[in-house]
Amino acid sequence: MSDLGSEELEEEGENDLGEYEGERNEVGERHGHGKARLPNGDTYEGSYEFGKRHGQGTYKFKNGARYTGDYVKNKKHGQGTFIYPDGSRYEGEWADDQRHGQGVYYYVNNDTYTGEWFNHQRHGQGTYLYAETGSKYVGTWVHGQQEGAAELIHLNHRYQGKFMNKNPVGPGKYVFDIGCEQHGEYRLTDTERGEEEEEEETLVNIVPKWKALNITELALWTPTLSEEQPPPEGQGQEEPQGLTGVGDPSEDIQAEGFEGELEPRGADEDVDTFRQESQENSYDIDQGNLNFDEEPSDLQD
């Protein structure tokens, strides 16, 4: 699942006027409050200005999707709520038909993302809450991906460090509620492949692996945020992650070390801690839905 997808539903164009009931100006343009039923089965009720949707309105797609909020010259702009056919929804700011600014996305599996958006993508500071486990990622996002300084918070411990391409990288630490923290770093390593896999084309699968260094008392964590990333060129679209950004449900990110038991060992031994005992932690479980973009149109007779 994803908060947007590859399919687009377009609003009717200027040549497909449909039926209209409402106010008009002196030159006959739709102006004021009105209702329109479009030839494709979509409907719009709300404010018009000089023949275009402008102000508060509700646009209902024939497949059940619905947008209620602000329009500026036929485009979603300002505050608005978009409800998708699968029941997921976005509530927040829009700019030029894109999720842009502060907003909350409620996924169909009850996960939520709260934070900044840029060109339809999670971008900036944000919090992703995993409903099933109660864990949450709090930190930086770049073009829809977990990237930069962040905390991954679990029930009785948390990981503090940096992420890149949705994976933890470099120095970091695990902080435990019992009053201690373990310092170490995530190193990229090749995963083991079975015999059948080795016979096929050689594909390098790199995963982050935790190497513990030492245990200390609790200390204040001061994240150093990475420099602000430049905005993507053109229209940004967040793809199903695992789909490709969320069209198919997510691409599981499996990093050893987010959950498990702490096993302190001698300083001269390599220690891989927090191994998952049962189910590997996939901490970017985006759910998806279709993206319905409205094509600008001059709705006037």
UniProtKB/Swiss-Prot annotation:
Basic and acidic residues bias spans: 21-31, 262-278
Pfam families named in the record: MORN
Keyword terms, alphabetized: Cell projection, Chromosome, Cilium, Cytoplasm, Cytoskeleton, Flagellum, Meiosis, Repeat
Disordered as annotated region, ranges: 1-41, 225-301
Biased composition (Polar residues): 279-290
Compartment annotation: Cytoplasm; Chromosome; Cytoplasm, Cytoskeleton, Cilium axoneme; Cytoplasm, Cytoskeleton, Flagellum axoneme
Biased composition (Acidic residues): 1-20, 249-261, 292-301
GO cellular component term of the entry, any: radial spoke
Cytoplasm found in the keyword field: yes
Tissue expression profile of the protein: Expressed in the trachea, ependymal cells, oviduct and ependymal cells (at protein level). Germ cell specific. Specifically expressed in testis, and to a lower extent in ovary. Not expressed in somatic tissues.
One BP term from GO: epithelial cilium movement involved in extracellular fluid movement
Chain positions of MORN repeats: 20-43, 44-66, 67-89, 90-112, 113-135, 159-181
Principal cellular location given in the protein's record: cytoplasm
Tagged with keyword Cytoplasm: yes
Coiled coil ranges: none
InterPro entries: MORN
Role description: Functions as part of axonemal radial spoke complexes that play an important part in the motility of sperm and cilia.
Quaternary structure (record): Component of the axonemal radial spoke 1 (RS1) and 2 (RS2) complexes, at least composed of spoke head proteins RSPH1, RSPH3, RSPH9 and the cilia-specific component RSPH4A or sperm-specific component RSPH6A, spoke stalk proteins RSPH14, DNAJB13, DYDC1, ROPN1L and NME5, and the RS1 complex-specific anchor protein IQUB. Interacts with RSPH3B. Interacts with RSPH4A. Interacts with RSPH6A.
PANTHER family xrefs: RADIAL SPOKE HEAD 1 HOMOLOG (PTHR43215:SF14)
Name of the molecule in the record: Radial spoke head 1 homolog
